[in-house]
């Protein structure tokens, strides 16, 4: 009997250890600050089921979220195409009592903020403004408060598409794995801009030795990610419908491949959006909107190049952002067009995806970030 009890206790401890609390944070285009804007769901790390925990009402269009390194604070872009209407906001999340509390906000320093990220020290927040083509840098205090901006980098030049590239359009702000540099894919200029980063400086961003890398003309670089080994980087091109692969070393990018995210017979307009790599570094996932509404799946070779594995319907409309949970077991897709969220279970051997559970309804959902606590 004692042996059975001991085994039961051990099993319960094992289940508890491998069922750490994981939470999915969703941003949205709520169009009205008197409606829910940020949502928090608990992710069952065994079944993939999402259960609503809390939400926040009182913020307009928190379309993109990022978390502080310790997961205590959530930062949101509050998107606005009105001159000086955008802002960046800070919230505190308490996983013990499941609460989400507003801390403060600052002006975004440019029109239409769309992406922001925190450095590993948690002392700095970097925001990209799409329409105005600028980047704003903010100190973060120990209590999660966003201080007034200390740098505002403005870019102007456009590229070959007069309808989409009349000027610079910063679409993401991504640190290198060592946090010595940060890259800004500029959809409007067909460039990936590079800056050195020093978290001890009062103005932490300075131009890199190579200030930008040119991308395919008319491709429109959008989102950007690094391989876990830090040797390779991947940029998805919204208008080019492709992922460009780069070798990376000390702030420098070297293009080694460009591969389409659509089947060869695809003839419609490209609307590629987001890109992520599985935690084990074996597979890359790229989302396509428009008539495709799918995720392209690629295997990653030893030299960083990609091979197409297949395509998975996202079971919804207009996938702006998706995310992988820290274990790599689940991939969560947001559909801003249909206002739905779908969870897929990932096969770690093949990279293929299988829908699990039911769709979650979140009006205007546009972003997801996932973290274990």
Label the predicted regions:
Residues 33-34, 59-69, 109-120, 156-179, ...:
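Beta-rich, blade/repeat-based domains predominating
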Residues 30-33, 79-84, 131-134, 189-191, ...:
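Short glycine/acidic-enriched loop and turn motifs that connect beta-strands
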Residues 51-57, 101-106, 157-163, 208-214, ...:
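A short beta-strand motif characteristic of beta-propeller blades
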Residues 20-44:
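An edge-strand/N-cap motif at the start of beta-rich repeat modules
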């Amino acid at each position: 009997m004692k042996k059975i009890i001991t085994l039961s206790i051990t099993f319960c401890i094992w289940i508890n250890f491998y069922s750490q609390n994981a939470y999915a944070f969703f941003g949205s285009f709520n169009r009205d600050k008197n409606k829910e804007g940020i949502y928090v769901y608990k992710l069952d790390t065994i079944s993939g089921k999402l259960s609503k925990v809390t939400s926040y009402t009182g913020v307009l269009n928190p379309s993109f979220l990022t978390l502080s390194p310790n997961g205590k604070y959530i930062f949101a872009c509050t998107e606005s195409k009105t001159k000086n209407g955008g802002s960046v906001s800070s919230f505190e999340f308490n996983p013990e009592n499941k609460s989400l509390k507003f801390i403060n906000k600052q002006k975004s320093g440019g029109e239409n903020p769309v992406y922001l990220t925190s450095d590993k020290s948690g002392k700095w927040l970097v925001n990209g403004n799409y329409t105005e083509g600028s980047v704003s840098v903010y100190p973060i205090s120990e209590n999660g408060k966003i201080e007034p901006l200390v740098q505002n980098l403005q870019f102007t030049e456009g590229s070959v598409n007069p309808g989409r590239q009349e000027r610079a359009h910063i679409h993401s702000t991504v640190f290198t794995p060592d946090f010595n540099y940060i890259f800004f894919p500029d959809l409007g200029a067909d460039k990936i801009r590079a800056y050195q980063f020093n978290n001890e400086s009062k103005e932490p961003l300075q131009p890199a030795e190579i200030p930008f890398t040119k991308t395919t003309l008319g491709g429109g670089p959008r989102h950007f990610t690094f391989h876990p080994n830090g040797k390779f980087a991947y940029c998805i091109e919204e208008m080019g419908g492709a992922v460009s692969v780069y070798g990376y070393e000390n702030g420098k990018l070297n293009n080694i491949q460009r591969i389409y995210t659509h089947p060869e017979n695809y003839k419609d307009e490209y609307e590629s959006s987001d890109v992520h790599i599985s935690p084990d570094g074996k597979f890359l996932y790229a989302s396509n909107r428009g008539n495709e509404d799918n995720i392209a799946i690629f295997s990653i070779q030893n030299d960083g190049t990609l091979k197409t594995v297949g395509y998975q319907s996202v079971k919804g409309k207009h996938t702006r952002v998706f995310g992988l949970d820290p274990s790599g077991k689940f991939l969560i897709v947001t559909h801003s067009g249909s206002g739905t969220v779908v969870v897929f279970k990932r096969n770690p051997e093949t990279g293929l995806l299988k829908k699990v559970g039911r769709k979650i309804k979140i009006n205007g959902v546009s972003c997801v970030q996932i973290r274990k606590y």
